[in-house]
Structures are given as C-alpha cells and as structure tokens.
Swiss-Prot record:
Source organism per UniProt: Baumannia cicadellinicola subsp. Homalodisca coagulata
The protein, known as: DNA-directed RNA polymerase subunit omega
Matching SUPFAM superfamilies: RPB6/omega subunit-like
NCBIfam families membership: rpoZ (TIGR00690)
Subunit: The RNAP catalytic core consists of 2 alpha, 1 beta, 1 beta' and 1 omega subunit. When a sigma factor is associated with the core the holoenzyme is formed, which can initiate transcription.
UniProt entry tagged with the keyword Ion transport: no
Catalytic activity, as annotated: RNA(n) + a ribonucleoside 5'-triphosphate = RNA(n+1) + diphosphate
Any single Pfam family the record assigns to this protein: RNA_pol_Rpb6
SMART domains given in the database record: RNA_pol_Rpb6 (SM01409)
Group of enzyme by EC: transferase
Entry keyword set: DNA-directed RNA polymerase, Nucleotidyltransferase, Transcription, Transferase
Gene: rpoZ
Length: 65
C-alpha cells in the first residue's frame, strides 16, 4: 500500500482545498484522458499517483487555471 504524506503535498499547494481540486483533476487526466504519469506507477491508483506528483513538485496550481 502506498504511503503518502498529505501534509507534504499541502505545503506544496498552500491549502488542503486547492490540493483536493488539483489532485482530483490530475487523477482524472491520468485515468480518463490517458495522460502519462510523471512518476512510476507502482500499481498505485490514479489518486495516489496524483498526490505523489504534487508532493514531488511536478504538478502545481497551474493545472486548475
């Protein structure tokens, strides 16, 4: 099971509400639109992949603009 520290992702985005919006949009891009993940998948769900991308600074606020 993947271990994601949400606090690290919140620090990258600024607040938890925007984190939810950004992670959901990125997860949809990966799952429905077929976008390639920017981190190794490791059999994780798209939501976990999105959070890992945010945590590593690969995805940010620009996705909701």
């Amino acid at each position: 099971m993947a271990r994601i520290t949400v606090q690290d992702a919140v620090e990258k985005i600024g607040n938890r509400f925007n984190l939810v919006l950004i992670a959901a949009r990125r997860a949809r891009q990966i799952q429905i639109n077929g976008k390639d993940p920017l981190v190794p998948e490791k059999n994780d769900k798209s939501t976990v992949i999105a959070l890992r991308e945010i945590e590593q600074g690969l995805i940010g606020n620009q996705i909701i603009d």
